[in-house]
């Protein structure tokens, strides 16, 4: 696995209001041979927190991709990366089956810097650990060789 990629995975979060597990898009960053971090991406279309009035506040916690970043990284719609909430997972080789595409190192450097800035200022949410079993339960791709 490269340093960072876009992954599509079905994940059930405690904050989810309904029981339906939906596919989510993440930027997955390989920290080392044992750990990966997931940062959730989000469409900015028609969302109140991304409108002109709220954008400056939202930018404190999200990296909102420029049109150039959207094009360079294969996103189809305006997208932001949630840098306030980090999901951690132990690395396992089957994880690569959820990979969708690569992202540029320039984007990853910006995102990591933003995550670190948010954390150093105590503005982050508590980290969430995702287990292999949780991913396996909702992502049948992981079970097949």
Task: Please place each PLM-identified region on the residue numbering.
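C-terminal terminal-subdomain/extension
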Residues: 59-145
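Loop/turn positions that initiate beta-strands
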Residues: 4-6
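Compact nucleic-acid interaction/catalytic patches
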Residues: 17-23, 28-68
């Amino acid at each position: 696995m490269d340093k960072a990629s876009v992954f599509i995975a079905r994940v059930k979060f405690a904050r989810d209001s309904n029981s339906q597990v939906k596919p989510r898009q993440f930027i997955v960053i390989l920290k080392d041979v044992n750990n990966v971090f997931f940062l959730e991406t989000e469409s900015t279309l028609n969302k109140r927190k991304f409108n002109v009035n709220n954008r400056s506040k939202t930018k404190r916690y999200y990296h909102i991709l420029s049109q150039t970043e959207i094009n360079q990284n294969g996103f189809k719609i305006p997208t932001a990366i949630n840098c306030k909430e980090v999901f951690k997972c132990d690395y396992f080789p089957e994880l690569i089956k959820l990979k969708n595409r690569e992202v540029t190192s320039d984007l990853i450097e910006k995102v990591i810097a933003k995550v670190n800035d948010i954390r150093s200022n105590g503005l982050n949410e508590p980290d969430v650990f995702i287990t292999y079993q949780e991913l396996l339960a909702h992502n049948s791709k992981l079970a097949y060789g």
